């Protein structure tokens, strides 16, 4: 089974503005057997809505619940936490970015993200897709 992990902004775009997804991102999502988000993404999305950095037509909780029906939520495990803090100092320092990237690594999934800082990080296997 193929699972792809959606970065927070990709989860929003997929649900509300799919035209913002690249062709490769759209194909990765379309061909996946399962879509997943890291638990920290729910906080990020709620925060972005509260700060009006994303626009929702319905209350934030209703939107999050609707989105959650279509994706698997993946929590922070000890191995994800250890991988996140072990990323080099050259990796972006934002804890959410580290946790999301580490989640993809630990599960062996591709991370769909537009974030150039994450996409430019070198890893032994391809991690990101955009």
Swiss-Prot record:
CDD domains: PIN_Sll0205-like (cd09872). Keywords: Hydrolase, Magnesium, Metal-binding, Nuclease, Secreted, Toxin-antitoxin system. One of its GO terms (molecular function) is RNA nuclease activity. The keyword Metal-binding applies. Its EC number is 3.1.-.-. It is found in: Secreted. Its cofactor is Mg(2+). It comes from the Bacteria. GO terms for biological process: negative regulation of translation. Mg(2+) binds at residues 7, 97. Residues 4-119 form the PINc domain. InterPro entries: PIN-like_dom_sf (IPR029060), PIN_dom (IPR002716), PIN_Sll0205 (IPR041705), TA_system_RNase (IPR052919), VapC_family (IPR022907). One of its GO terms (cellular component) is extracellular region. Pfam families: PIN. The keyword Nuclease applies. Toxic component of a type II toxin-antitoxin (TA) system. An RNase. Upon expression in M.smegmatis inhibits translation and colony formation. Its toxic effect on colony formation is neutralized by coexpression with cognate antitoxin VapB22; the effect on translation has not been tested but is probably neutralized also. Belongs to the PINc/VapC protein family. This is Ribonuclease VapC22. It comes from Mycobacterium tuberculosis (strain ATCC 25618 / H37Rv).
């Amino acid at each position: 089974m193929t699972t792809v992990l959606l970065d927070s902004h990709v989860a929003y775009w997929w649900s509300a503005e799919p035209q913002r997804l690249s062709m490769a991102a759209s194909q990765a999502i379309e061909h996946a057997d399962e879509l997943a988000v890291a638990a920290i993404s729910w906080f990020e999305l709620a925060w972005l809505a509260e700060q009006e950095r994303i626009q929702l037509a319905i209350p934030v909780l209703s939107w999050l619940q609707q989105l959650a029906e279509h994706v698997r939520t993946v929590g922070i495990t000890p191995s994800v936490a250890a991988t996140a803090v072990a990323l080099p100092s050259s990796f972006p320092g934002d804890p959410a970015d580290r946790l999301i990237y580490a989640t993809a690594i630990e599960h062996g999934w591709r991370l769909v993200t537009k974030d150039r800082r994450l996409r430019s990080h070198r890893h032994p296997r391809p991690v990101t897709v955009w």
